[in-house]
C-alpha cells in the first residue's frame, strides 16, 4: 500500500534538492535491473564519488537497497519505492517536462 508521505519525500529527494536529477537517473536504471556503483558511474557518465554520495542519500531514505559485500555489492530499488512507484513516475515525468521548457 502506498505511503501517504511518500510523495513529499520523493519530491524532496528528486525535485527539491541539488542532485535530484542524477538521483532520478540512478533510480531509472535500477528499475531495469541491479547495478554496482562502477556500472552506474559508467552508464550515467558520472564520477564514482558522485554516485557513492547519491546512493548514500537514496539508502538513507529507503529508496534503494543493496545485496552483497564489498566489491560485489549491487543496488536495486527498495520495496518502499516499488510500493510508491506511481508517485516516483509522476514526479519523474514532471521533471522531464520542466527540463524541456524553453
Q: Where are the model-predicted features located?
A:
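Glycine-centered, phosphate/nucleic-acid-interacting loop/turn motifs that mediate DNA/RNA or nucleotide
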Residues: 62
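Short, Lys/Arg-rich nucleic-acid/phosphate-binding segment
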Residues: 20, 68-74
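Pre-recognition alpha-helix immediately N-terminal to the DNA-recognition helix
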Residues: 24-28
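Amphipathic alpha-helical dimerization/coiled-coil segments
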Residues: 1-10, 79-102
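Short helix-coil-helix linker/hinge
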Residues: 16-23
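A short acidic, leucine-rich amphipathic alpha-helix
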Residues: 39-43
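Short capping segments at the starts of secondary-structure elements
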Residues: 21, 32-36
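Key DNA-contact positions within bacterial/archaeal DNA-binding proteins
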Residues: 49
Amino acid at each position: 500500500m502506498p505511503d501517504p508521505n511518500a510523495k513529499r519525500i520523493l519530491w524532496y529527494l528528486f525535485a527539491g534538492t541539488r542532485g535530484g536529477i542524477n538521483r532520478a537517473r540512478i533510480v531509472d536504471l535500477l528499475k531495469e535491473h541491479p547495478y554496482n556503483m562502477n556500472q552506474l558511474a559508467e552508464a550515467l557518465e558520472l564520477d564514482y564519488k558522485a554516485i557513492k554520495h547519491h546512493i548514500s542519500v537514496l539508502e538513507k531514505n529507503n529508496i534503494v537497497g543493496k545485496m552483497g559485500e564489498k566489491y560485489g555489492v549491487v543496488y536495486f530499488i527498495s520495496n518502499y519505492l516499488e510500493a510508491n512507484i506511481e508517485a516516483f513516475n509522476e514526479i519523474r515525468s514532471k521533471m522531464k517536462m520542466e527540463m524541456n521548457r524553453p
